[in-house]
């Protein structure tokens, strides 16, 4: 990256669930620079990021947004680093020190999510990791909406669905899943991207050519299909 010379071997700040501002490479390099240095002046920032265009304007925007604090012509980070897992919610913006014990613990935090649709009463239920790196349908649609970078597993689903409209995709995916309320095996003779997506998500498995079985837990009365 343009700021590789400013990367550090020690602790760094990692941001989860970035917005358009906090996703910027300069923003991420700047907060790590301020994390490593104390009593930083504007002159020091300009020397460290020589050649960065509109630096003053960007800095003012970060201050106005509440991410950077300026006092007595000195600059420091104004956000709070994560110090507890208590009260975490899915998709909240998180700043965490990569050397913190919490950084590894975050990888184990999951939330049970239910996804409804406008076509029928079927509900898809998944355990979604806080980092949204695992392959779940909920996280895939989330990243399509926020334009966050896909994980390698999620890219496999993108190769099938692309930036599909969630309502459109759910219409066909749930309609196919509903067939399993009536039978254990479903035959699909024509190639179908939504069936391919269900297999990629481990909602289904192809037990023989063009024949599929459900790999989810199903509550036929409440129409809840839970990924195992």
Question: Across the structure, where does each feature detected by a protein language model lie?
Answer:
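Polyanion-binding and phosphate-handling cores
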Residues: 12-102
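Short amphipathic alpha-helical interaction segments
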Residues: 49-64, 184-201
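Short, amphipathic alpha-helical interaction segments positioned at domain boundaries
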Residues: 81-115, 218-228
């Amino acid at each position: 990256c343009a700021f590789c010379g400013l990367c550090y071997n020690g602790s760094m700040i990692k941001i989860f669930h970035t917005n358009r501002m906090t996703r910027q490479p300069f923003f991420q390099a700047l907060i790590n620079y301020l994390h490593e240095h104390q009593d930083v002046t504007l002159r020091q920032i300009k020397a460290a990021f020589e050649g960065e265009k509109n630096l003053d304007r960007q800095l003012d925007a970060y201050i106005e947004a509440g991410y950077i604090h300026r006092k007595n012509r000195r600059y420091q980070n104004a956000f709070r680093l994560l110090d507890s897992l208590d009260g975490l919610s899915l998709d909240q913006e998180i700043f965490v020190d990569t050397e913190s014990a919490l950084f590894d613990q975050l990888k184990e935090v999951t939330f049970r999510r239910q996804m409804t649709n406008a076509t029928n009463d079927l509900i898809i239920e998944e355990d979604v990791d806080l980092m949204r790196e695992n392959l779940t349908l909920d996280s895939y649609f989330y990243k399509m909406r926020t334009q966050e970078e896909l994980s390698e597993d999620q890219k496999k689903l993108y190769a099938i669905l692309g930036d599909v409209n969630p309502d459109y995709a759910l219409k066909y995916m749930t309609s196919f899943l509903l067939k399993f309320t009536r039978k254990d095996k479903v035959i699909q003779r024509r190639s179908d991207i939504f069936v391919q997506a269900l297999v990629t998500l481990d909602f289904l498995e192809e037990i023989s050519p063009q024949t599929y079985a459900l790999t989810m837990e199903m509550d036929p009365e409440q129409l809840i299909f839970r990924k195992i």
